[in-house]
Amino acid sequence: MANISSIHILFLVFITSGIAVMATDFTLRNNCPTTVWAGTLAGQGPKLGDGGFELTPGASRQLTAPAGWSGRFWARTGCNFDASGNGRCVTGDCGGLRCNGGGVPPVTLAEFTLVGDGGKDFYDVSLVDGYNVKLGIRPSGGSGDCKYAGCVSDLNAACPDMLKVMDQNNVVACKSACERFNTDQYCCRGANDKPETCPPTDYSRIFKNACPDAYSYAYDDETSTFTCTGANYEITFCP
C-alpha cells in the first residue's frame, strides 16, 4: 500500500501536469409506454452495460465511462430474446441482447465523445441513421453551454411513405434518405463528400423541421453538436 507521502506526491504530479482524471455517469431512462432494450457501442474505451440490456417502462440504469470514452446509445424495440440472450429486435437490432456491433438502421442515436478538444465533452442526437424512438440528452452538473439535445417529435407519424418501416401494419421506424436510396447525393460521398457539395435535401429538412436540435444528415454540424465540461448525462427514451 502506498504511504501518505507517495500519495501526496502523486496528487501533485496530476495537478501540476494539468491532468484531470474524471469519470462520467450516464443514466439511461425509459419513459416509453413499452419495454425497450438499450444498445451501447464504444468507439474508444470499454464496452458499457455489457453492450445492451432491458429497460421496462419507467426503469433506468446508470453506466460509468472513463475520460476519453466515445460511443453511442440507442433504443431497440420489439425484441424477443431467449434465456441466453439470443434473438432479434424489430428496430435497432444488434445481434443479441448484448450487442455485437451498432444497431441496424433506422435508429435514433445518442452520440458522445468525452473530454475531447479543450477538455470538453461533445454530444449529439443523430438521425443520420434514421429514427425509431424519441430521444433526449440532458447534462447535469457541468459547465459551459451544456444545452439539452433531443428529438422529441414523433417522426414515425410524419415519415414519408417511401421511408416508412412497417411491422404488423404499424410504422415502427423512419429511414434516412441515404438508407433508402443509397446515392452519393443523399449519403454525402463521392463528389458529394464535402459540406459545399452535400447540402440539405427535402428529406433531411423533414427531419430537421421536426427535430431542430438533432443531426438530420451528415453535415448538419452547426446546429446539432453540443458541448459541456465535467457533466453527467441523462439519456431518456421517449422524453
From Swiss-Prot:
SUPFAM superfamilies: Osmotin, thaumatin-like protein. It is found in: Secreted, Extracellular space, Apoplast. Coiled coil: none annotated. It holds the Pfam family Thaumatin. Disulfide bonds join 32-238, 79-89, 94-99, 146-228, 151-211, 159-174, 178-187, 188-198. Residues 1-23 form the signal peptide. InterPro entries: Osmotin/thaumatin-like_sf, Thaumatin, Thaumatin_CS. Induction: By 2,6-dichloroisonicotinic acid (INA) and salicylic acid (possibly an endogenous signal for acquired resistance). Strongly induced by pathogen infection. It comes from the Eukaryota. GO terms for molecular function: mRNA binding. Partially responsible for acquired pathogen resistance. Belongs to the thaumatin family. This is Pathogenesis-related protein 5. It comes from Arabidopsis thaliana (Mouse-ear cress). The lineage of its organism: Eukaryota, Viridiplantae, Streptophyta, Embryophyta, Tracheophyta.
